[in-house]
Amino acid sequence: MAYNHRISQQFHSSQQHGRGSRKKEDENDALMRLPDKEIAGCINDIGIPFTAADLIKPNPQQVQMVLEWFAELLMNTTRETVEPAMRAAADDICGDFPDIVPTDTRNLMGFFVNMRRLMAECGVNDFTFTDLTKPTHDRLVKIFSYLINFVRFRESQTAVIDEHFNKTEKTKQRIETLYTENQEMEQRLEEMRRVLKANEAEVKEKVRRNDELKSRLRELGRTQEKVAETLERVKAEKARQQNLLKEKMERTVRTRQEVEKLRPYVMESPASLQSSLTELSESLLREKNQIDAMEKRARALQTSSDTFTVVSNDVQACIKLLEDIAVELQKEEDEESRASRNKEAISERGNNVREVEQTEKLLQRQLARWNERIEALRNTAHEKAQVAQKRMEELREVQIKLREERTEKQRDMERRRIRIEQTEKKMADLKESIETEIQSAHDEYLKLESHIKLYITEMEKSL
């Protein structure tokens, strides 16, 4: 196999560049590295039995246990905490074949991802899965040294870390409190809306009844006015009838007096009058001197008779008028009793109306107070809802930023993983090419050696 000089030069140049960067890393590692006994003592201090011999000949399970303790201390992450997420990922990827990836391996891979992030924060940027499964002494010294130094630095900055952690916890508690208050305010707002709807129906019913009572009151007022007018007319008619009755009674008394005066004349019979007339006519001759007086008396009697007839007719008319007046008086008394009952009913209705008006005013004041309270609560709830909404928007923005950062980190991790795989592939190809060159160089060396031996043999023969 021929020797490739170009590949050899490229390999040497890459080796020189790698040696330069490795030299800087070695200087940093030299500053950060701790003695084996100090590392073992620190691990023993955390409660895990560990010796320098365990560091020289590492056990993967023991190393994983120590790293898991550091991860739990610094990130609150263990294989148990990543198990649900890894199980869900396995269910999504493997589907009906969950046994393709064993549970321990799956959890260890999830733990490795978190551990690699921690190691990157500690300064170990070349942490690989092999450091968990096949650790070496040099790698463990570097990893544990960086971890212990990071823990020491963290302990020296405990006050600042606790301050930021307390701020974070307070922020979380404040968010939870605001969310709870927002939920409570929403429930109270819904309850107030339901109460407002119920009160609106009741108030509408009260207003409707109030309007009905007002219309009824107006009708009663108009009826009262009509009854008052009728009562005034009846009173005027009563006064007129009383005056008329008084006049009729006075006329009746005068008529009765005149009748009493004329009664002696009326009680005499016609026969006696005829006899008297005969006697008068017989004595006419004897009493010629009394003829004029008798004629006057006869005319007076005729006048009295006509007057009696007229008075009798007037008495009959007065009796009939008295009967009509009695009927009218009875009607008037009935009207007065009805008017008094209507007046009492009107006064009672007026009292009811006043009570209704007072109740309405009270309900209006209560409604106004409730409306003010509801408006104040609504404004307060609206302000708190706006504040909560703004806070939720801020939290959403923070969440979006965190998601973007997480996505970017995942993409970066994926790019790094691809880059690492490509680098490993290049290294494998380069290793293969180097081995091929070494093999070809070895073959060339063997050929040259055989040629030289042959040449020496020939030279010896020729000598």
UniProtKB/Swiss-Prot annotation:
Residues 1-27, 331-354 are annotated as: Disordered. Residues 1-18 have a biased composition (Polar residues). Keywords: Cell cycle, Cell division, Centromere, Chromosome, Coiled coil, Kinetochore, Mitosis, Nucleus. One of its GO terms (molecular function) is microtubule binding. Residues 166-455 form a coiled coil. Pfam families: Nuf2, Nuf2_DHR10-like. One of its GO terms (cellular component) is nucleus. Its main location: nucleus. Acts as a component of the essential kinetochore-associated NDC80 complex, which is required for chromosome segregation and spindle checkpoint activity. Component of the NDC80 complex, which consists of ndc80, nuf2, spc24 and spc25. This is Probable kinetochore protein nuf2. The lineage of its organism: Eukaryota, Fungi, Dikarya, Ascomycota, Pezizomycotina. The gene is nuf2.
